[in-house]
Amino acid sequence: MNKQQQTALNMSRFIKSQSLTLLEKLDALDADEQATMCERLHELAEELQNSIQTHFEAQYGIGVEQP
């Protein structure tokens, strides 16, 4: 995997991680509507990360290392 592809995968992991952190903060603030939106954002971030990883694995025929 080249550097740009690794960067894209790392960015997707970061977005997933940060959306979960935001969800926890919104839950603590009892911001239910926003927490629901953020939960969907986190689910989409997870789907995106999995899609990117699968794409690169298929492209190169190798596994992508997990951090």
Annotate each predicted stretch with a short phrase.
Residues 3, 11-65:
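Short, charge-rich amphipathic interface segments used for partner binding and complex assembly
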